[in-house]
Amino acid sequence: MSGHSKWATIKRKKDAIDSKRGAIFTRVGKEITVAAKMGGGDPEGNPRLRLAILKAKSVNMPKDNIERAIRKGTGELEGVTYEECLYECFGPGGIAIMVSAVTDKKSRTTPEIKSILTKLGGSLATSGSVSRLFEKKGVIVLESSQISEDELVDVAVGGGAEDVINEGDVYRVISVPDNYETVLHALNEKGLKSEESEIRYIPLVSSEIADKEVAEKIMKLIDQLDGHDDVTSVTSNFELASSLEKEFE
């Protein structure tokens, strides 16, 4: 898992430079709207909405934006209707990719995702052929300068976390989905701020790539998928071979 995590760290640094706050708010807002539409606007009785709000707060989304997104979902405000899409994909070198999206028009989003895949050596897969290679986990990323690893392990495991991964400048805290909210609360109570926090797919087994050209194609593909306006998350089982790590620092 370490190689995959190192790639995730490389990509996270790039995203910190390239991402725009407005785009992040739009994505999270869609997730809140869908959650409110499916389970109602009360976060106390809608766990999914509660988690979406926690995610919004973790990226400092203004309270007004959050409330507006909820009202759109409950029908109190007029707006477009969103639906969720999950795309199972294969990429260059046979890697597996899971793409989650929220869209107001699936008939537009699906061909666009397919086009990105085709242009960069990927393809859509049949349902179940890729998802079986992943499992859902709570993932919380925070800067390591905030706390020592030993202290974080005590706090996170005490809150129900399964694992704490030290990636140098960041820690990655992993939990089962049912414990995600409890772990996040424990970290917040400690005064720790997360850079990312969500329930997402993570690979059961990584696929190591040692060919530089293939690795470059994979990275470009993941970046383009992640950059699509409707995409909320992209996860792959791509692991960069240690022999190539310096090439992408």
From Swiss-Prot:
Gene Ontology terms describing biological process: regulation of DNA-templated transcription
Disulfide bonds: none
Primary site of residence: cytoplasm
Domain of life of the native organism: Bacteria
Keyword annotations of the record: Cytoplasm, DNA-binding, Transcription, Transcription regulation
Gene Ontology annotations for the cellular component aspect, listed alphabetically: cytosol
Name of this protein: Probable transcriptional regulatory protein LA_0720
Species in which this protein is naturally found: Leptospira interrogans serogroup Icterohaemorrhagiae serovar Lai (strain 56601)
